[in-house]
């Protein structure tokens, strides 16, 4: 059966290069991932440790911490962590485990005062993680006990734009290094000032990678999203990638003449001509899908729950100056994305059913439409095999083939020429 030799067996050691032969080939020869990558409990467990336990994982939007004393409870590579700010407003992150006997401190987001209390024996910690209260503990006559030795175990937390990221790997590069040149590419949007306008979460019966891959490729656009294709035409899609842990595409120009959903809201101030006329669609590895338009953004944060279950946290962002947007104006944009997302959810859930069926061997990828998937798969392979590598940008010789660059070859012209 074509491609079957490239499908890793259920007993494959995913920490070795032998399991990734089809992925490591050039895009013109590469295969998609085998079904085990989406359906195997063993793969999922390894992935949580090697991908989500070592990467800069998005854990929310910065303004989720706006209330003083707000604490976010998040899963990071299967480990529960707490995210907050100290009294100076600086980001802090900790393991969600009391240093006394390991009790979980919080089970849901909440707002605390100056002290975070363990529900078991009331040990208390300030928002820097320092142990500040041990009721009746020292009075019991314990020897050589120094509270400064028993603060909460810290984790790294950084802000990128208006997004919050956490990392369990204390040796990982900074989040700015992780995303490479993407910060400069998006600098004109001034994302650090954008704010949440609406959020909701939904469970999707599909592997998190299926959700991400569906976002990254536009091969399906005409058939799954006929309405989206009116404002984001297939022939106007081009690669939007460089040095950094991200995969992306851009729609240039946006075609608002057929459907005006994206024209209702005011655009951000200070955008250059290219950003004003374009949509940027970027998958930030591993778990953020960012649709960035001149006047709003739709962000999907993926939380893997199991091999075939993903919790998708959706947030609509607006730029500074949009605080007074009318509900009826925003509703048009909201409903547009709900429609698109519903179409995507339906097809990725169908994809999961097919992968679970046991009848799939890896297919080939389209260089023009699916190269971001090849890049994504290789990022995944790097993390799974223990390679700490940040990918480079596109090679100059690849630009026409992959539909990228400042002045990409017209889509139809390229296909007709070959």
Language-model region placement:
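Short Pro/Gly-enriched beta-strand edge/turn motifs at strand-loop
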Residues: 54-66, 136-140, 281-286
């Amino acid at each position: 059966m074509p491609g079957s030799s490239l499908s890793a067996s259920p007993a494959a050691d995913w920490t070795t290069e032998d399991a990734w032969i089809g992925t490591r080939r050039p895009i013109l020869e590469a295969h998609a991932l085998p079904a085990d990558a989406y359906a195997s409990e063993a793969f999922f467990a390894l992935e949580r440790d090697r991908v989500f336990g070592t990467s800069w994982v998005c854990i929310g939007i910065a303004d989720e911490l706006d209330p003083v004393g707000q604490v976010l409870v998040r899963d990071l590579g299967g480990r529960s962590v707490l995210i907050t700010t100290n009294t100076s407003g600086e980001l802090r992150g900790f393991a969600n485990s009391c240093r006394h006997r390991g009790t979980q401190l919080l089970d849901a987001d909440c707002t605390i005062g100056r002290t975070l209390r363990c529900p078991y024996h009331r040990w208390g910690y300030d928002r820097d993680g320092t142990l500040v209260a041990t009721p009746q503990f020292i009075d019991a006559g314990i020897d050589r006990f120094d509270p400064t030795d028993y603060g909460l175990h810290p984790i790294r937390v950084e802000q990128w734009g208006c997004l919050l990221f956490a990392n369990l790997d204390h040796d990982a590069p900074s989040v700015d290094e992780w995303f490479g040149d993407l910060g400069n590419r998006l600098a004109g949007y001034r994302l650090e000032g954008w704010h949440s306008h609406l959020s909701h979460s939904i469970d999707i019966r599909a592997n998190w990678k299926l959700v991400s891959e569906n976002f990254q490729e536009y091969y399906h656009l005409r058939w799954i999203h006929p309405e989206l294709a009116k404002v984001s035409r297939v022939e106007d899609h081009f690669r939007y990638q460089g040095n950094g842990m991200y995969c992306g595409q851009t729609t240039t120009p946006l075609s608002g003449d057929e459907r005006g959903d994206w024209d209702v809201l005011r655009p951000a101030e200070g955008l250059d001509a290219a950003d004003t006329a374009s949509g940027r669609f970027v998958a930030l590895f591993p778990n953020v899908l960012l649709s960035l338009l001149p006047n709003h953004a739709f962000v999907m944060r993926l939380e893997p729950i199991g091999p075939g279950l993903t919790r998708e946290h959706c947030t609509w962002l607006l730029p500074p100056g949009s605080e007074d947007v009318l509900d009826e104006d925003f509703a048009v944009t909201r409903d547009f994305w709900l429609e698109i997302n519903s179409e995507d959810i339906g097809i990725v859930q169908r994809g999961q059913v097919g992968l679970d069926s046991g009848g799939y061997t890896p297919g080939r990828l389209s260089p023009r439409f699916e190269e971001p998937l090849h890049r994504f798969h290789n990022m995944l392979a790097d993390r799974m095999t223990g390679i700490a590598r940040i990918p480079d940008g596109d090679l100059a010789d690849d630009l026409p083939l992959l539909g990228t660059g400042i002045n990409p070859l017209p889509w139809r012209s390229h296909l007709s020429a070959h």
